Design a protein with these regions (language model features):
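ER/Golgi luminal nucleotide-sugar-dependent glycosyltransferases, focusing on the catalytic module
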Residues: 1-203
Length: 203
């Protein structure tokens, strides 16, 4: 990690190592866990300031999922689940509350508000898991100065007396979508596969 980590203050190294252990050179688990851990920085990363997790597509709704989770949205808009309407906003409303994304977007700085709104309406995929590696402290600082004041404003709207997985972690889910938007707007990221390590199955 010497060549890549030299771009970071020491305070960020723990986070970088955390992500490296979960970003393998391929998607499928074809061996033991240790064989999937990156032992060095891939050469493909060298010309990029930002590494993001691969995008997840959210436009493949099954009828059973629509009936179970999306019926409230469907009742409000019978055309909501047409293929052309299956975007980030729809996904967020189904799992994290109708109208909550718009409430949050309305609290963004003027320079980001409508661009992020368009991102949620036009995109049906995003870089998931709130995971990124950044070699530019200037870029990272700009991102933090954008996202954290916004999330603090959101706290005044949503509070912390929240219930259910989708709403209890709403700040993380908002940040996940915003991260994908922001780094794709202000940099040219390189994406890398993500896998999940299930301790009940993979030890």
């Amino acid at each position: 990690l010497t060549s890549f980590s030299s771009f970071f203050p020491k305070i960020f190294l723990g986070g970088i190592l955390f992500f490296l252990k979960r970003w393998p050179p391929f998607k499928a688990i074809k061996g033991n866990f240790n064989s999937l851990v990156l032992q060095s920085v891939p050469e493909e990363w060298e010309n990029y300031e930002i590494i993001l997790g691969e995008e997840i597509n959210i436009n493949k709704w099954k009828l059973s999922k629509i009936i179970k989770r999306g019926y409230k949205v469907l009742l409000r808009n019978p055309l909501a689940f047409k293929k052309k309407n299956q975007n980030i906003k729809l996904n967020f409303e189904v799992f994290h509350g109708i109208g909550n994304l718009d409430k949050a977007i309305n609290l963004l700085d003027d320079s980001e508000r409508e661009d992020f709104r368009s991102f949620t309406l036009l995109k049906s995929s995003y870089n998931r898991q709130n995971m990124f590696i950044c070699r530019s402290t200037k870029l990272m600082d700009s991102y933090f100065r954008s996202i954290f004041p916004w999330l603090e404003r959101c706290e005044k709207i949503f509070g912390f007396d929240l219930h259910g997985y989708g709403k209890t972690r709403i700040y993380g889910f908002l940040a996940e979508r915003y991260m994908a938007y922001w780094f794709n707007k202000y940099s040219k990221p390189f994406t890398w596969p993500i896998f999940f390590f299930d301790t009940s199955k993979n030890w």
